[in-house]
């Protein structure tokens, strides 16, 4: 069996792919996968198949499908259900679009997406629980239970990143949308302010990512020979606007690894402005004057987080087949910061 185990996002999904060997006899796919996938039960695979998350040669199959040589199998597994209950919290939401199948929300910086790692309250999912509970009594829409693992988040963004997020409201929508993320047929662009200026106007960063062995809370680019479990990642970037010592860039994700843009931009020498985890909270470029230092400190105070915004999101609607595209304007803190840099004159800070 030729296999490629890939974890696109260790908070939400385990994504697995293999090609069945030539000598393989016909066998139920749930049994075949349980024998070849580590720490995965047959019942878990059956659950994935029931949700439409097991595909052979691009088509969803049932758990009783019999594999044959040459079959290309893809599996998308939810992580095991969490042992806590998400209770409704009245947290304001900026809902960009909603129908019976899905919801697109514009997440503010500072809001954790889902519980975990010490954050078990005041998350986006708690806000969604409130929204769905109260919406059902006002609008003629079915009740959505955010604790149902077959619905919910399709992807995520970091706590201090703002911008667009997609939520599935039915199991069918989640399976369809998850497959689009798995196949990289979604469109996602981010706007980021980074340290330094560029000689080129665009480029591509390719570098496999895994946790840093010296600090498990951050990621780094690895050589695959040195760290075989690192996950390949590709980021395309282009310059939107250059300032004297920082640059506004657009990043387009080909893959969706944790901290991908933040790690990749640091890797090429351009950490995100005010990104504490990846070295962007230091004065990396510019003048050695007290006035300039004060200017940067004022900038940090104006937007005290990594300057990263999930600007656009494109995908195919899981029920209608319509191609949908959403654009989110910068939040107030990022807008104010960019305006400050546009007004900056180096000779006034000598």
Show which residues each predicted segment covers.
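RNA pseudouridine synthases
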Residues: 1-350
């Amino acid at each position: 069996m030729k296999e490629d185990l890939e974890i696109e996002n260790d908070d939400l999904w385990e994504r697995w792919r293999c090609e069945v060997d030539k000598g393989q006899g016909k066998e139920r796919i749930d049994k075949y996968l349980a024998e070849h996938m580590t720490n995965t039960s047959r019942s878990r695979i059956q659950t994935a198949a029931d949700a439409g998350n097991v595909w052979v040669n691009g088509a969803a199959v049932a758990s009783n499908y019999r594999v044959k040589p040459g079959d290309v199998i893809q599996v998308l597994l939810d992580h095991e259900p969490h042992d806590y209950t998400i209770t409704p919290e009245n947290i304001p939401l900026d809902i960009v679009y909603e129908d019976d199948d899905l919801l697109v929300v514009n997440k503010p910086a500072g809001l954790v997406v889902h519980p975990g790692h010490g954050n078990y309250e005041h998350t986006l999912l708690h806000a969604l629980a409130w929204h769905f509970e109260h919406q059902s009594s006002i609008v003629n829409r079915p009740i959505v239970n955010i604790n149902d693992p077959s619905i919910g988040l399709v992807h995520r963004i970091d706590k201090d990143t703002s911008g667009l997020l997609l939520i599935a409201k039915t199991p069918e929508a989640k399976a369809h949308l998850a497959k689009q993320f798995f196949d990289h047929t979604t469109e996602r662009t981010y706007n980021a302010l980074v340290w330094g200026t560029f000689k080129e106007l665009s480029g591509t960063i390719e570098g496999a990512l895994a946790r840093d062995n010296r600090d498990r809370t951050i990621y780094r680019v690895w050589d695959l020979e040195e760290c075989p479990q690192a996950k390949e990642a590709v980021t395309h970037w282009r310059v939107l606007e250059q300032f004297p010592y920082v640059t506004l860039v657009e990043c387009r994700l080909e893959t969706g690894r944790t901290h991908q843009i933040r790690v990749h931009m640091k890797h090429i020498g351009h950490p995100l402005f005010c990104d504490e985890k990846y070295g962007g909270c230091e004065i990396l470029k510019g003048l050695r004057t007290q006035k300039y230092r004060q200017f940067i400190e004022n900038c940090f105070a104006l937007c005290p987080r990594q300057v990263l915004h999930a600007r656009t999101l494109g995908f195919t609607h899981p029920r209608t087949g319509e191609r949908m595209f959403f654009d989110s304007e910068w939040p107030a803190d990022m807008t104010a910061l960019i305006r400050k840099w546009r007004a900056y004159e180096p000779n006034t800070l000598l």
